[in-house]
Design a protein with these regions (language model features):
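Cell-wall polysaccharide-cleaving catalytic domain and substrate-binding groove, primarily
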Residues: 1-108, 115-118, 122-198
């Protein structure tokens, strides 16, 4: 598969699994008083860029979460993000994130070539593509990273510690299993990729 095809499948997978959020998701960022939005929880400059692609989005750009909430506009922002134009903008930006940020990071992992495994890792990249890259690089010599089940087990049992967020360990274990179930069942035959045989 080409990088573009992998990026597109990664973007589609992030949307279909909902591991980062729904199209219309709006919450307060854990990093400050600004909105975290959409199916990839964009915030800050990336969030403002997303809003710039949607008619009416400029009204929300640069505003704090509390300002939007206190003015009673959270549902309006959610509706904007969930609109057809909002969904199209998110898919475009997500595909671009996968191609421009996540694929180059994963490309630095030696001997990491299996298409399903790359798609699996892409679905973790929104947590931090640099942490995912280092996580895989640090395990490259000791584990077969071209084995989807091995990747699932590594992310389920070691990623929360490696990412220094043990409080998410249970959620990450669930995410690891959900992503595995999604990626293992993908029909990638159009790209010449065989069915997963686990």
């Amino acid at each position: 598969m080409t990088d573009q095809e992998l990026a597109n499948e990664g973007a589609k997978g992030l949307v279909e699994t909902g591991v980062e959020g729904a199209f219309d998701a709006v919450s307060r960022s854990t990093a400050g008083d600004y909105p975290s939005m959409g199916c990839s929880q964009w915030e800050g400059p990336r969030g403002n860029m997303l809003l710039g692609y949607i008619d009416g989005g400029d009204h929300f750009a640069g505003r704090s979460y509390s300002d939007i909430r206190d003015s009673g506009e959270l549902s309006a922002l959610s509706e904007l993000l969930g609109s057809e134009q909002g969904q199209t903008a998110q898919l475009m930006l997500l595909s671009d994130d996968c191609l421009q940020m996540y694929m180059p990071a994963l490309g630095k992992v030696p001997k990491f070539w299996d298409s399903r495994c790359i798609i699996y890792a892409l679905l973790w990249c929104p947590t931090s593509h640099n942490v995912v890259r280092r996580f895989l690089q640090n395990r490259n010599d000791d584990y077969d990273l071209s084995d989807l089940a091995v990747l699932r087990d590594l992310f389920a049992t070691q990623y929360a510690t490696a990412a220094d967020c043990e409080e998410y360990a249970e959620g990450y274990a669930n995410r690891a299993e959900n992503i595995f179930n999604y990626v293992s069942s993908l029909d990638l035959s159009a790209y010449g990729v065989a069915e997963y045989e686990g």
